[in-house]
Amino acid sequence: MSFTKIAALLAVAAASTQLVSAEVGQYEIVEFDAILADVKANLEQYMSLAMNNPDFTLPSGVLDVYQHMTTATDDSYTSYFTEMDFAQITTAMVQVPWYSSRLEPEIIAALQSAGISITSLGQTVSESGSESATASSDASSASESSSAASSSASESSSAASSSASESSSAASSSASESSSAASSSASEAAKSSSSAKSSGSSAASSAASSASSKASSAASSSAKASSSAEKSTNSSSSATSKNAGAAMDMGFFSAGVGAAIAGAAAMLL
């Protein structure tokens, strides 16, 4: 079975130069030609590896292609190459101990001899250039995006500055109008206060004059009342004096009558 694996690998590698499928590129053809050359030159090593290392397996599809190839009468079997995963075949070859030291340099040399510029297996210069172009395009897009963002930020800043200036101007105008209105209101309030003071002063003066007049009238009335009281007192004193005199006269009269009566009584006795 191990020999069958090697035979299949050799057969597929040998048939790779006859690939007619458009889906299989020159890169794969040159790579398998290099593998075939190494297998032929070191057949015993490959057979020993296949017999002693059970982990060394061929990718699916290789044996099927081998069977079609051994039974076909023409190159129609090459149409089955599209069913194989060439990347898996390369992975299988990477498992050999001498891949890095011997097989990889041979494959790179074969690719370069075929006119394929390559820096490492799996990537060509053209692919690298394509990636560089893509990176350059991405960088250009990033630069344009950055420029657009910067322009947008500048416009936003300008708009914000203009809006702030207009708002400041409107606020200043509103404050000035408010201040003027406040000054006018204060002036009118001062006039009203002055008028109120004047009116209050006149009213107070009139009230004081009225109070003074009333006080003067009250004083006159008081003087009259005092004079009347004095007259009443004098009259009372005079009446008292007269009454006292009359009482005294009545006393003397009563005493005289009593004495006369007493004297008459004595004479009768």
Curated annotation (Swiss-Prot):
Induction: Induced during anaerobic growth. Residues 246-269 form a propeptide. Extensively O-glycosylated. The GPI-anchor is attached to the protein in the endoplasmic reticulum and serves to target the protein to the cell surface. There, the glucosamine-inositol phospholipid moiety is cleaved off and the GPI-modified mannoprotein is covalently attached via its lipidless GPI glycan remnant to the 1,6-beta-glucan of the outer cell wall layer. GO terms for biological process: fungal-type cell wall organization. It holds the Pfam family SRP1_TIP1. It is found in: Secreted, Cell wall; Membrane. InterPro entries: SRP1_TIP1, Yeast_SRP1/TIP1_CWP. Its main location: secreted. Residues 128-242 are annotated as: Disordered. Residues 1-22 form the signal peptide. Transmembrane segments: none annotated. One of its GO terms (cellular component) is cell periphery. This is Cell wall protein TIR3. It comes from Saccharomyces cerevisiae (strain ATCC 204508 / S288c). The gene is TIR3.
